[in-house]
Amino acid sequence: MIKRLALFGAAALTLTACAPDAAAPAVQAPGAVAEELLLPLPDATTPAITAADLAIRIKTLADDTFEGRGPGTPAGEASAAWIAAEMARLGAAPGGDNGTYFQEVKMVNQTVDPATSELVVTWPDGEDLSLGFKSQAVYWTKRQNAGQVSFAPGDVVFVGYGVVAPEFGWNDYAGQDYTGKTVVILVNDPGFATGDASLFKGNAMTYYGRWTYKFEEAARQGAAAALVVHETDAAAYGWDVVTGSWTGAQSDLVRADGGASRAALEGWITRETAEQMFAKAGLDFTAQKAAANARGFAPVLMEGLKARGTVNQTIEPLSSRNVVAVIPGATTPDEYVLYTAHWDHLGMKTGEKTGREGEDFYEDDIFNGAVDNATGTAALLEIAEAMKAETLDRSALFVAVTLEESGLLGSAYYAENPTVPLNRIVAGINMDGALPIGLTRDMVVVGYGASQLEDRLKDVLATQGRSIKADPTPQAGYFYRSDHISFAKKGVPMLYADGGEDKVDGGVAAGKAAAAAYTAERYHKPMDEYSDDWDLTGFEQDIQTLFQVGRDIAKSADWPTWYAGNEFEAARKESLGGQ
C-alpha cells in the first residue's frame, strides 16, 4: 500500500487565506478554504503539464489517508477540501455556493444488513430458496424513509431487457400490470446480444442497456422488485465488481419523495441463479434470452414462482460536495469552457477479504481509486494550473464532482443546479480513469461520432503524429458511465477522451492487455493503488492535448456543436433558444 504522508501541524494546514506561489495571486475570503487539511499541498508545481506534477497529485489523492474518498465520510470530504485548497493555491477563483469552492450535495447513505435481510424465491412445490447475499444475489432498496422495507409474495415475470423505447419500436413490458410483482431483467440491450445493427445501436450499448435505466423503468412500471441478471460480457465487468460496488454503504441524493417511487428492492442475481429460477418454472434461460432479442417479445410469467423480500438497513443523512473553481476570461467571462472529473471512489469496506491470499492487498479494506479517478482529478488540477498561466478570452470552469460511483449523482445534481447557465457553457471535456501505460499513437474517444469537439481533438493529435480512435468496446456503454453524460443530456457538447490503445512500446496488443488486466485485477478493488513505477508519459501527453483543445476554444469565438442528428442536438438547440 501507499505509505501515509506525514501530517503537518493544524496551524500550517488551515487555509483561511491561501499562500500560493508568486505566479498565482492569493484567493481571498470568502472564497478561501477554512478547513484543516489531512495532507499537505505540493511544495511547488509548474504551469507546464508534467508527469512529475501529475504523479504528486495522483499519489496524494489515492493515499490511504483519504480512505478511498467515500462521499460524505470525513476522510472523503477531506479529499474534496484538499482539491479546493489546491485550486486556491493555483489562483483559480471559487465558483461554488456563497463565494466558496463548494456546492453542497445533500445525500443519504443506506447500508443493508445482510444478516437480517432476505430475498426469497418460492418454487412451485412450495420450497423456499433464500438467495445467498453476494454468493447468489446483491440487493438493496432506494427507499430512504424506513429502516425496514418489505414486499409481499408476488409473481415473478421475465421482461427481457426491461426496455420501453418508442423510438426503437420496443416495449418489453407491454400487456401486463406489474404491481406487486418481481421482474427479472437482462443487462445491456438486444443490439449487443445479437450484433444486429438494425436493433438499437447494434453492438454499441445505449442508455437502455444500463443498469440505472433498468431499475428506473421497473419503478415506472410499478414493480415491487427488480432483479438484473449479471453476465460478465454483457455488463462489461465480473461478479466481483458487483459485490465490491453494490455492498456496504450505498449513496443517493436526498429525494423529495424519499425514494417512495422506486421498487421496494433492487438487485443483481448471478446467471447461475437465474438459470435455476427459470428451470424451476419449466423454462430454459438460454431459449428465453434468445426470444427476448426479437422484436415483438412478450413478457413471460415464470409459472409457479413467487418472490418476497425484506431489506433491513441503516440510513445516514449526510452531505457531500462538488468542488467548483473558475479562471475568469478577459473578453467574454460569461462564456465557459468546462472541465470535469469525479473525485469520489468507493471508500472503505471494513473487514472484507477483497484480494487474493499471498497478495499485499489481501484483506485491504481501502478502495483507493488511483486510476479511478485520482488520475482525472489530478488532470483537472494540472489543466487549471496551466490555464492560469494563459490569457483567456472565455472563462475556464472546473468541476470536481462527487457521487459518480453511486450513479453519476454529483454531476446530475450540478446539471440540475448549475452555478453558471448551462447555455453559456460553450463546450466541456470530461476526464475519468486514465491507465498509466506509457506513450500511445492514439487517443480513444468514448461515444465517437458525437460532436465537433472531435474535429478539434483530431487536429491537435495530428500535430503530434497521433490519431483519434473510436471506442474499441462500445458494448460496455462507457459513454453512459461517466459524468459528461449529465451535461450532454442538457445539451452541452461534451468530449470524453481516454488514453490511447496503440502503445508505442508494444502496439495495440499491449494496450488491450493492459486495459484487460486493469479491469480484471484492479477496477473497483483495493488493488487500484498508485505505484511509483507508473509510466505517466502517455498521460502527460494526453492531458497536454485536452488542455490545448480547451484552451483554443477559450481563446476563440467558436461554438462547437453536436453533429447533425445526434441524440443531444435538440436539447442544445432548445437551450440556445432555437439557434
Question: How would you name each of these model-derived features?
Answer:
Residues 159-240, 334:
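A conserved hydrophobic secondary-structure block that centers on an alpha-helix together
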Residues 381, 385, 389, 503-571:
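His/Asp/Glu-rich mid-to-C-terminal helical/loop segments that flank catalytic regions of hydrolases
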Residues 134-136, 148, 174, 180, ...:
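Metal-dependent peptidase/peptidase-like ectodomains
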Residues 203, 234, 347-453, 564:
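Acidic/histidine-rich catalytic neighborhood of metal-dependent amide-processing enzymes
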Residues 67-197, 301-303, 311, 315, ...:
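Noncatalytic luminal/extracellular "stalk/propeptide" segments of secretory-pathway proteins
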Residues 15-17:
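C-terminal motif of bacterial Sec signal peptides marking the signal peptidase cleavage site
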Residues 22-97, 328, 563, 579:
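N-terminal hydrophobic or amphipathic helices/low-complexity stretches enriched
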Residues 122-125, 134-175, 259-369, 382-385:
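Soluble metallo-hydrolase cores and metallopeptidase-like ectodomains found primarily
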